[in-house]
């Protein structure tokens, strides 16, 4: 048996026509071939020890081709079949150097369906770039691609069979959740929004991964082993960073690099050029990072200007952060207001020079920063050394002009008792017990002296007699 297989291998390797039709020159006619022992599938065929060469070489090359739609396990059903030497997993030819750099695009133009044993998932889905122009078939293709690409469970595509692109774009998250679980709705809706907003007509799998970065269930945390996901939305609003936890029953599967395109031309790809999951960089690193100095620079410069007053410590830090040349000692950490002192001693030294305090160090500076915690100007970032975070809302409130605190009564006339107080020169007598009601006449409020003041026992000094001419007549009109 071993000698029979060796002789069959030698015969097949000498006949190069077996390897020219499937991936060779395209001018050869495309035909189909079944295994020579297909009728005896599962049985051991009997062959003579010597295989006559003329039985193999006499066949025309155009009829000796390999049908890639065949399952290799079926072709290899007979151990003595020479076809097992020419078909390998993934559609590659053993012993043919021309198949290593095969053109994937030309192959897909000839094959409408991928072989069932393809593990690289290289079938391309081509739909219009604008989802509003999709037909019901396009919607179905998009759903089938998303289910296979991201392993979405429990997606009933039949529920979407009467939905075209326009209706799909009008659907809200609640509409998606009525047709599929919430986990799938997040992914599908996030991808659909990206397809609607992107200006590029050519979409690749990298673009899809970037689109799904905004999905809270697909943002994989670097330090949590897939248990926590990060939802950064810091492109415009610095304070919108959030952390949420996924459901434990839905494990995260890294997106595969398949080919999702919209009117795109096929790109040459092959299994040899397919990067392994260990070498694929994380999509977070591929996303273009926003420059915090461009986003926070104008705000830092405006807030760091104290005007005519003395500069405060938090304004001095913003002044350093507004210039990227100071990144050697202090730098922004993202666009949410977080910063880090890479050289805290240098920051303290510069602050000491500004305030004419040569003994300034980081310990004194950090104690001064604690004063701003209660003012909601900045906070300490826990778990990070020399890291702080500005609260721009608190700074805006702290800079609001406060009205000056006025006294309850600006003038003596505002006091309710000052009218009667000024009517009598004896200032000590207005606190006497049980003062009688003041007489009110039509001629003058202070027309006549009150008999209370002339009473020898009514005042504080009972033995003091007051003259009757004590009240001048002009006091009533003066006050």
Curated annotation (Swiss-Prot):
Record-listed Phosphoserine modification sites: 48, 81, 96
This protein's encoding gene: ERG
Native source species: Homo sapiens (Human)
PNT domain sequence ranges: 113-199
Keywords, in A-Z order: Chromosomal rearrangement, Cytoplasm, DNA-binding, Isopeptide bond, Nucleus, Phosphoprotein, Proto-oncogene, Transcription, Transcription regulation, Ubl conjugation
Annotated localization: Nucleus; Cytoplasm
Region (Disordered): 34-56, 72-92, 242-293
GO BP field: cell differentiation; positive regulation of transcription by RNA polymerase II; protein phosphorylation; regulation of transcription by RNA polymerase II; signal transduction
Keyword Nucleus: yes
GO cellular component terms given for this protein: chromatin; cytosol; nucleoplasm; nucleus; ribonucleoprotein complex
Annotated Polar residues bias: 34-47, 267-281
Assembly and interaction partners: Identified in a IGF2BP1-dependent mRNP granule complex containing untranslated mRNAs. Interacts with SETDB1.
Entry GO MF terms: chromatin binding; DNA binding; DNA-binding transcription activator activity, RNA polymerase II-specific; DNA-binding transcription factor activity, RNA polymerase II-specific; RNA polymerase II cis-regulatory region sequence-specific DNA binding; sequence-specific double-stranded DNA binding
Annotated family: Belongs to the ETS family.
Protein name: Transcriptional regulator ERG
DNA-binding positions: 311-391
Described purpose of this protein according to its UniProt entry: Transcriptional regulator. May participate in transcriptional regulation through the recruitment of SETDB1 histone methyltransferase and subsequent modification of local chromatin structure.
Keyword Transcription regulation in record: yes
Gene3D superfamilies from the UniProt entry: Transcription Factor, Ets-1, Winged helix-like DNA-binding domain superfamily/Winged helix DNA-binding domain
Pfam families reported for this sequence: Ets (PF00178), SAM_PNT (PF02198)
Positions marked as site (Breakpoint for translocation to form ELF4-ERG oncogene): 462-463
Site of covalent link Glycyl lysine isopeptide (Lys-Gly) (interchain with G-Cter in SUMO2): 282
Superkingdom of the source species: Eukaryota
Disease (UniProt): Ewing sarcoma: A highly malignant, metastatic, primitive small round cell tumor of bone and soft tissue that affects children and adolescents. It belongs to the Ewing sarcoma family of tumors, a group of morphologically heterogeneous neoplasms that share the same cytogenetic features. They are considered neural tumors derived from cells of the neural crest. Ewing sarcoma represents the less differentiated form of the tumors. Chromosomal aberrations involving ERG have been found in acute myeloid leukemia (AML). Translocation t(16;21)(p11;q22) with FUS. Translocation t(X;21)(q25-26;q22) with ELF4.
């Amino acid at each position: 048996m071993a000698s029979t297989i060796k002789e069959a291998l030698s015969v097949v390797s000498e006949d190069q026509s077996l390897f020219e039709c499937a991936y060779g020159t395209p001018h050869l006619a495309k035909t189909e071939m079944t295994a020579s022992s297909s009728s005896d599938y599962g049985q051991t065929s009997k062959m003579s020890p010597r295989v006559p060469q003329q039985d193999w070489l006499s066949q025309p090359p155009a009829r000796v081709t390999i049908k890639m739609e065949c399952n290799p396990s079926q072709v290899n059903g007979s151990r003595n079949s020479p076809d097992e030497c020419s078909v390998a997993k993934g559609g590659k030819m053993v012993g043919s150097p021309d198949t290593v750099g095969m053109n994937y695009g030309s192959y897909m133009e000839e094959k409408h369906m991928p072989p069932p044993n393809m593990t690289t998932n290289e079938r391309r889905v081509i739909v219009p770039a604008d989802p509003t122009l999709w037909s019901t078939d396009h919607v179905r293709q998009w759903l089938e691609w998303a289910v296979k690409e991201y392993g979405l469970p429990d997606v009933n595509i039949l529920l979407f069979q009467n939905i075209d692109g326009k209706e799909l774009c009008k659907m809200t998250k609640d509409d998606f959740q009525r047709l599929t679980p919430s986990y799938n709705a997040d992914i599908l809706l996030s991808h659909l929004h990206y397809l609607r907003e992107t200006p590029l007509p050519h979409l690749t799998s990298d673009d899809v991964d970037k689109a799904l970065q905004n999905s809270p269930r697909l943002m994989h945390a670097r330090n949590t082993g897939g248990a926590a996901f990060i939802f950064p939305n810091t492109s415009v609003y610095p304070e919108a960073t959030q952390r949420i936890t996924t459901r434990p029953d839905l494990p995260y599967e890294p997106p595969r690099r398949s080919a999702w395109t919209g009117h795109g031309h096929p790109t040459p790809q092959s299994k040899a050029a397919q990067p392994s999951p260990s070498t694929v960089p994380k999509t977070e690193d591929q996303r273009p990072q926003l420059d915090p100095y461009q986003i926070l620079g104008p705000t830092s410069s405006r807030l760091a200007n104290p005007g005519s007053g003395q500069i405060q410590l938090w304004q001095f830090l913003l002044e350093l952060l507004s210039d990227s040349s100071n990144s050697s000692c202090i730098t922004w950490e993202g666009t949410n207001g977080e910063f880090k002192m890479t050289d805290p001693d240098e920051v303290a030294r510069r602050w000491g020079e500004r305030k004419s305090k040569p003994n300034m160090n980081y310990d004194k500076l950090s104690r001064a920063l604690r004063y701003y915690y209660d003012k909601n100007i900045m906070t300490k970032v826990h778990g990070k050394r020399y890291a702080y975070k500005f609260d721009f809302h608190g700074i805006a409130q702290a800079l609001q002009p406060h009205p000056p605190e006025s006294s309850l009564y600006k003038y003596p006339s505002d006091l309710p008792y000052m009218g009667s107080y000024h009517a009598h020169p004896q200032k000590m007598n207005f606190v006497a017990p049980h003062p009688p009601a003041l007489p009110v006449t039509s001629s003058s409020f202070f027309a006549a002296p009150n008999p209370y003041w002339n009473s020898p026992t009514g005042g504080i000094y009972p033995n003091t007699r007051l003259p009757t001419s004590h009240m001048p007549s002009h006091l009533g009109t003066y006050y």
